[in-house]
C-alpha cells in the first residue's frame, strides 16, 4: 500500500518539476526561443487563441524570432497581442511576417530575471513540500487504519523525505543552470 503512495508522490513531484521547467522556458534569457511567446494569446475571431495555434514561430538567428501566421488577416492582431504581452520586445510587421529582434539584456534586467527565476524556484519547492505533506498524511491514515505498522510508517516517511530532498535538489540544479544562462553576456 505504501508503494502506491510512493509512486503517486513521485509522479506528482515529477509533474511539479515539469511545470517549473515550462514556467522557466517563458523567462527570456539572451537568446531567441519560441517558448518566449507561449503566454501570448491573440484575439482571433472573437476568441483568445494561443499564438502558436495560429502562426508558426521560427528562430532564423540567435536573437530573432519570425512569426508566420497561417491566416495573413491575423497579422495586425498578432502584432497587438505581442505588444500587449509586455515582453520587452518590439515586433516589426512587413505585411507577410512579423519579426521580433531580441535585444541584449541589460545588467539590471538580468538581475530582475534572476529574481523571477528564484521566485519560480521557491514556488516549485513549496509545491514539492506540499506533495510531501499530502503523502505523509496518506501514510498516517494507512497506519491509523491498521494497514501498516508504526515502523513501516517511519520507514515510508523517511523515503518520502529522501524523495523530497532529491526533487528539491533537482529544482536547485535547474535554477542554477537558468541563472547561469541569464547572466551570460
Swiss-Prot record:
Similarity comment: Belongs to the RRF family.
Disulfide linkage: none
GO process terms (BP): translational termination
Keyword NADP: no
GO cellular component terms given for this protein: cytoplasm
Molecular function, one GO term: ribosomal large subunit binding
Species per Swiss-Prot/TrEMBL record: Bacillus licheniformis (strain ATCC 14580 / DSM 13 / JCM 2505 / CCUG 7422 / NBRC 12200 / NCIMB 9375 / NCTC 10341 / NRRL NRS-1264 / Gibson 46)
UniProt keyword list: Cytoplasm, Protein biosynthesis
Localisation per UniProt entry: Cytoplasm
UniProt cross-references to Gene3D superfamilies, sorted A to Z: 3.30.1360.40, Ribosome-recycling factor
Pfam family, one: RRF
This protein's name: Ribosome-recycling factor
Function, as annotated: Responsible for the release of ribosomes from messenger RNA at the termination of protein biosynthesis. May increase the efficiency of translation by recycling ribosomes from one round of translation to another.
Family annotation (PANTHER family): MITOCHONDRIAL RIBOSOME RECYCLING FACTOR PSEUDO 1, RIBOSOME RECYCLING FACTOR
Amino acid at each position: 500500500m505504501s508503494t502506491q503512495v510512493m509512486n503517486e508522490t513521485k509522479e506528482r513531484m515529477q509533474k511539479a518539476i515539469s511545470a517549473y521547467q515550462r514556467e522557466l522556458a517563458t523567462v527570456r534569457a539572451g537568446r531567441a526561443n519560441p517558448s518566449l511567446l507561449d503566454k501570448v494569446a491573440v484575439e482571433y475571431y472573437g476568441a483568445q487563441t494561443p499564438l502558436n495555434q495560429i502562426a508558426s514561430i521560427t528562430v532564423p538567428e540567435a536573437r530573432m524570432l519570425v512569426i508566420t501566421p497561417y491566416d495573413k488577416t491575423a497579422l495586425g492582431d498578432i502584432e497587438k497581442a505581442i505588444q500587449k504581452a509586455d515582453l520587452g520586445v518590439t515586433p516589426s510587421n512587413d505585411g507577410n511576417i512579423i519579426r521580433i529582434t531580441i535585444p541584449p539584456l541589460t545588467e539590471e534586467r538580468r538581475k530582475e530575471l534572476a529574481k523571477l527565476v528564484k521566485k519560480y524556484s521557491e514556488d516549485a519547492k513549496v509545491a514539492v513540500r506540499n506533495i510531501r505533506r499530502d503523502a505523509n498524511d496518506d501514510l498516517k491514515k494507512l497506519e491509523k487504519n491498521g494497514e501498516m505498522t508504526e515502523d513501516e510508517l517511519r520507514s515510508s516517511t523517511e523515503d518520502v523525505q529522501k524523495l523530497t530532498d532529491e526533487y528539491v535538489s533537482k529544482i536547485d540544479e535547474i535554477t542554477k543552470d537558468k541563472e547561469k544562462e541569464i547572466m551570460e553576456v
